[in-house]
Amino acid sequence: MAGALVRKAADYVRSKDFRDYLMSTHFWGPVANWGLPIAAINDMKKSPEIISGRMTFALCCYSLTFMRFAYKVQPRNWLLFACHATNEVAQLIQGGRLIKHEMTKTASA
């Protein structure tokens, strides 16, 4: 069973359809876009003082918009959808960190 699945996957990777997909914007666009969520995830280790509320809000709106686009475009671009879903979650976490930081700052003042 597993051998047949591996063989089928290997055949697909060798196919012209897969090569065409690798050479399309449906692949390279999302690959380039992965820099945003990777940077947001990396910034979670840094102090919340560096978080820009306006930029976090803008990136949340951007990711929501392009999640919808990735779902509506035909054929559906699941790689782009996953990229923006990851970025949306990362930005919401960053926004939560900023709100918590601001609340503790005003409570201690």
Swiss-Prot record:
Main location: mitochondrion
Keyword annotations of the record: Acetylation, Disease variant, Membrane, Mitochondrion, Mitochondrion inner membrane, Transmembrane, Transmembrane helix, Transport
UniProt organism field: Homo sapiens (Human)
N-acetylalanine PTM positions: 2
Gene Ontology terms describing biological process: mitochondrial pyruvate transmembrane transport
Name of the gene this protein is made from: MPC1
Record-level Gene Ontology MF annotations: pyruvate transmembrane transporter activity
Segments on the Mitochondrial matrix side according to the record's topology features: 2-20, 72-109
UniProt-recorded name of the protein: Mitochondrial pyruvate carrier 1
UniProt record similarity statement: Belongs to the mitochondrial pyruvate carrier (MPC) (TC 2.A.105) family.
Function: Mediates the uptake of pyruvate into mitochondria.
Localization of this protein: Mitochondrion inner membrane
